[in-house]
Amino acid sequence: DLAILFYSPIAWFILIVFSFLTTASFTSLMENIVTDYDLSGGKEASLSGICFLGSYGFLSSVVSNIYIYIPLLTMGLISRETASGSIKLAYSSPVTSGQIVLGKYLAAIGFGCCLMLVPIASAIYGSLVIPSFDWAPVLVALLGLYLLICAYCAIGLFMSSLTTYQVVAAVGTLIILAILNFVGSIGQEYDFIRELTYWLSINGRTIDMLNGVIRSEDVIYFVVVVTLFLTFTTFKLTSDRRTISRFRQAISYLGFFVAAMAIGYFTSRPGMIKVWDTTRTKLNSLTENSQRVLAK
């Protein structure tokens, strides 16, 4: 499946455009930072953080734009084979629906690794030219970017299984991503609903990682979302291979969704959340004195 992706001109188009725009963004950012650094007399304490981390860092711009590329990548993973009829060959082979889905998903995130080479190369270059480069938070930010790519790929794969039209699959993926971005604003007047919609929202899930902080809640969110949409896709292919009533399909989808929400709700309780600040100066952590005051 990964080899088939590279036979597609769309995959090469994505790789070339992403590499060009990302490199141009990094070059422009570095130029501005070097200028500001010279004007300030070289007094900035953490150039690695300024260049790569935070809302205005290089990796934040990559995170903001990655949603454009993934739907184009995933739109044909299943819909192309469904439209051509070649999916029936997979159905007749001695492989399960889960194995088919897993193979296509691994191909998608494998291509995501190719995309990751561009920001990784930028980070390596930064480590060579920036004194006392703080690798740990930058690696966490890169992890956040890759987890986001994995989530987008799982969503796109599911949408590709719903239609034979690649454009419809791409548009559907963008719609799902838009819903997940804005769902956090629903039900704000009710505590329980607010907590559920807040957890379901993908908006801001990488903010802490882009600052070098790993939160268990965010990592679990990405794992649950990926698992949920891969389960959806597997069930969709299974229902295509054998007759399953629409009522049973609806109940199954609802059951998967409720289970995911339950996991997310309980793992996002304050007592369940673990936080790891990887910055060298523990910039995002409270001091020990502050923690003792809050404990009282």
What are these regions (language model features)?
Residues D1-S19, Y165-L174, R248-G255:
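Alpha-helical transmembrane segments and their helix-start/interface "positive-inside/aromatic belt" motifs
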Residues L29-L53, L162, A169-K236, D240-R241:
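Terminal transmembrane helical anchor/hairpin motif
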Residues V17, G54-R80, L115:
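Long, hydrophobic alpha-helical segments
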Residues P9-I33, S61-Y69, I175-I179:
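Hydrophobic alpha-helical transmembrane segments of multi-pass membrane transport/permease proteins
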Residues T23-T27, A45-S61, L102-Q166, V225:
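Secretory targeting signals
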Residues R269-K296:
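Juxtamembrane extramembrane loops of integral membrane proteins
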Residues S245-P270:
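Internal/C-terminal transmembrane anchor helices
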Residues P71-Y91, Y105:
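Transmembrane helix boundary and interhelical loop/hinge segments in multi-pass membrane proteins
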